[in-house]
């Protein structure tokens, strides 16, 4: 059964929204979305909340064949440069990873 993975984070100090968007479009999304086990890969820039406080700037929403399949993605040789650049783009202390199963209606 597939899982949905949510990764939330803020940008590292000094990284602008424009720099992030360019990196996301040119490196991250094309690379990660074509890896084995990844069914869909979407990035959402958070514009705001109903409460005024934004807990994260970015949410990645990934549909994967399984949690184990997703865990393998960052180990693939093709992903090494993207992973290294991610840790320069994202504020490490802000990264949170959640996964779960959709409740079908």
Regions found by a protein language model. Give the residues of each.
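Short, well-ordered beta-strand segments in beta-rich or mixed alpha/beta enzyme
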Residues: 3-11, 43-77
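Intrinsically disordered, low-complexity N-terminal regions enriched in serine/proline/glycine
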Residues: 8, 19, 40, 75, ...
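Residue-level signal for secondary-structure boundary sites
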Residues: 15, 68-70, 105
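Short amphipathic alpha-helical segments
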Residues: 16-43, 78-83
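Functionally constrained cores in energy, signaling, and assembly domains
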Residues: 24, 28-32, 60-64, 70, ...
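Glycine-rich beta-strand-turn "strand-cap" elements at beta-sheet edges
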Residues: 39-59, 82-105
């Amino acid at each position: 059964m597939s899982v949905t993975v949510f990764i939330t984070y803020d940008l590292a100090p000094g990284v602008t929204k424009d720099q992030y968007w360019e990196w996301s479009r040119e490196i991250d999304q094309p690379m990660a979305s074509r890896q084995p086990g990844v069914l869909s890969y979407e990035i959402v820039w958070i514009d705001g909340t109903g409460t005024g406080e934004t807990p994260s700037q970015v949410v990645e929403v990934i549909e994967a064949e399984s949690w184990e399949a997703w865990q393998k993605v960052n180990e693939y040789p093709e992903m090494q440069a993207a992973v290294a650049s991610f840790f320069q783009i994202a504020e490490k202390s802000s990264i949170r990873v959640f996964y779960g199963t959709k409740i079908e209606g």
